[in-house]
Design a protein with these regions (language model features):
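Short metal-coordination and nucleic-acid-contact micro-motifs, chiefly zinc-binding Cys/His arrays
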Residues: 24, 32, 159
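Structural alpha/beta surface segment adjacent to cysteine/selenocysteine redox centers
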Residues: 31-34, 40-118, 190-194, 202-205, ...
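Conserved acidic functional residues
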Residues: 29, 33-35, 162-164
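N-terminal acidic, proline/glycine-rich, low-complexity intrinsically disordered segments
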Residues: 1-14
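C-terminal cap of thioredoxin/glutaredoxin-like
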Residues: 114-214
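Extreme N-terminus of proteins, especially the signal/transit-peptide cleavage junction
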Residues: 13-26
Length: 214
């Protein structure tokens, strides 16, 4: 899988705006927990969408630990570190950390530990001390605020991914594998149309495959 950085997506947004879907770059806000493989799949789709549509994704943190009232360290270290990255480097660097840590968690099957988080931070040129701080409650209030901002519009009976677009929000889409090229753009077009109707709540079928990381 070809990974995409913040520099790549800025270039992609410019390229997309000159193509057949010319127009102002649309902001999409995406809430994720680094441990969730389904959020990972959807995030890779959104980065592909940025290649073919005038879209820019801003990544935010929600917590499955908070949602499920769990204090499991494996559920907390990734989200705490992501908040630490946001506080230290700004919103736009969160995507780079997410790619680095998600690649390790989901493709590399690496453990959800301080050492794994440090390796992801090191890859991004970020302060490895964030990983140690992520074992504490230092950023928990900020994590809770980010979580609530993402989840309040969709409720507590869904998880991640959550996407906010055009003043509304939905859980999903849950996809496997993540579509590429114009297929990714077409799925986004449909998703955007669904979000435009305020009375839309749910469209679902049973999953027959797990996350396919291609």
């Amino acid at each position: 899988m070809s990974e995409i950085t913040s520099t790549d997506t800025a270039a992609g947004a410019t390229a997309a705006s000159t193509g057949s879907h010319e127009g102002q770059v649309k902001r999409v806000d995406f809430w994720f927990d680094p441990v969730c493989p389904w959020a990972w799949m959807t995030s890779r789709w959104m980065l592909e969408v940025e290649r073919v549509r005038s879209v820019h994704t801003v990544f935010h943190v929600m917590s499955l630990g908070l949602l499920n009232h769990s204090d499991d360290p494996e559920l907390l270290i990734g989200v705490r570190a992501a908040i630490g990255v946001r506080e230290s480097y700004g919103d736009e660097r969160v995507r780079d950390f997410y790619t680095a840590i998600g690649t390790r968690f989901h493709l590399g099957k690496q453990p959800k530990t301080v050492d794994t988080v440090k390796a992801a931070l090191r890859e991004c040129g970020m302060d490895e001390a964030i990983a140690d701080q992520a074992t504490t409650t230092l950023w928990d209030d900020l994590l809770s605020t980010s979580h609530n901002e993402g989840m309040k519009p969709v409720g507590t009976d869904v998880g991640t991914p959550v996407i906010h677009i055009n003043g509304t929000a939905l859980f999903g889409p849950v996809i496997s594998p993540a579509p590429k090229g114009e297929d990714a753009g077409n799925l986004f077009d449909g998703f955007e149309k669904v979000t435009a109707y305020p009375g839309f709540f749910e469209l679902k079928r049973t999953r027959t495959v797990g996350p396919i990381f291609d």
